[in-house]
């Protein structure tokens, strides 16, 4: 028992060294189900659907480690001036028909030129540090061929970082370390955030590129420039392609590359198997050195306006898997203002 407690403490030190105040690996939260809400990583997705798309997410990471990351968010985005609500390639013309089947999508046409606006609210807590981000996004969509559309988007917002010294277990740490401030209570600092992205999409594929934290900044809890945490730009590259196994079953493999200078590229891969517009299952794998992990996912659409999905993540590293516990993530979606004859037009 003592050895297990000791090992858990060692694992905790390793984890928080990677994601703590002076770390750069998790300045942005990680999401297992990003492929279901690409908007969270790329503002160019803003307003891509035929309705207002609202998502709620809760992620509990490494459940056996006290103070491990807990992330929740709300996103909402929708189109402005989109005139093809009843004529999109996946519009449901026959009640009960499958809007995702291959024969329906054969007549796919790109979206008409339109705008999109959105809002993002993210809460991320790790140990004695919590971050709250509020962002507003805008995107413009236009067809570039008879089957393909391109969108460009921007996001601007503010992040509040709160350090609660009362929750710090000091141990060998120095309470007078200026990197974590001198106040005995809570310290809050704010900084602006900006991001930009491009999104190329059709009935079969999507390719996206985005940069979040596009303007590097330094978070300081004291005035001395020597101390503080540098916030680096995060580059994301995403791509996916859908194949039809049958008229009602499709498979969507996708991949995301994440680059945070000076760290190596992180690779996130997923595959999603969907039956009609009813339910889906999926799996993923993250290559991230000692934090690599495998993910199992499943989701269901309930009616035309509500959907829910769940993912379970397990570390590949045996010691991390044993002592850190699993990671759970729930995503709930609401399609607001969606007409009875309109279904999601995009492959995710």
Write out the residue ranges for each language-model feature.
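Sec/Tat signal peptide C-region and signal peptidase I cleavage site
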Residues: 21-25
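Sec-dependent N-terminal signal peptides
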Residues: 5-19
């Amino acid at each position: 028992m003592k050895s297990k407690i000791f090992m858990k403490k060692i694992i905790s030190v390793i984890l928080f060294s990677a994601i703590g105040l002076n770390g750069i690996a998790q300045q942005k939260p990680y999401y297992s189900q990003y492929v279901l809400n690409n908007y969270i990583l790329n503002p160019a997705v803003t307003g891509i659907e035929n309705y207002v798309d609202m998502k709620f997410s809760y992620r509990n990471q490494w459940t056996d480690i006290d103070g491990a990351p807990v992330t929740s968010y709300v996103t909402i985005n929708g189109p402005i001036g989109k005139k093809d609500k009843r004529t999109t390639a996946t519009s449901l013309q026959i009640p009960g028909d499958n809007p995702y089947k291959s024969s329906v999508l054969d007549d796919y046409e790109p979206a008409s030129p339109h705008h999109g606006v959105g809002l993002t609210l993210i809460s991320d807590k790790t140990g004695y540090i919590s971050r709250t981000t509020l962002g507003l996004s805008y995107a413009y969509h236009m067809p570039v061929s008879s089957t393909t559309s391109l969108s460009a988007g921007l996001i601007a917002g503010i992040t509040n970082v709160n350090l609660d010294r009362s929750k710090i277990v000091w141990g060998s740490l120095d309470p007078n370390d200026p990197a974590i401030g001198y106040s005995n209570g809570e310290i809050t600092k704010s900084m602006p955030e900006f991001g930009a992205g491009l999104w190329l999409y059709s009935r079969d594929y999507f390719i996206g590129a985005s940069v979040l934290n596009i303007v590097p900044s330094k978070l300081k809890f004291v005035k001395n420039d020597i101390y503080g945490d540098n916030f680096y730009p995060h580059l994301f590259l995403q791509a996916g392609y859908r194949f039809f196994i049958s008229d009602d079953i499709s498979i969507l493999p996708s991949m995301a590359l994440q680059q945070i200078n000076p760290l190596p590229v992180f690779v996130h891969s997923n595959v999603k198997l969907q039956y009609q517009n009813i339910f889906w299952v999926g799996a993923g794998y993250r290559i991230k050195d000692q934090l690599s992990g495998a993910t199992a996912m499943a989701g269901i659409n309930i009616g035309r306006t509500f959907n829910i999905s769940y993912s379970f993540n397990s570390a590949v590293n045996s010691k991390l898997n044993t002592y850190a516990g699993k990671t759970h993530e729930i995503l709930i979606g609401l399609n607001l203002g969606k007409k009875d004859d309109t279904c999601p037009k995009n492959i995710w």
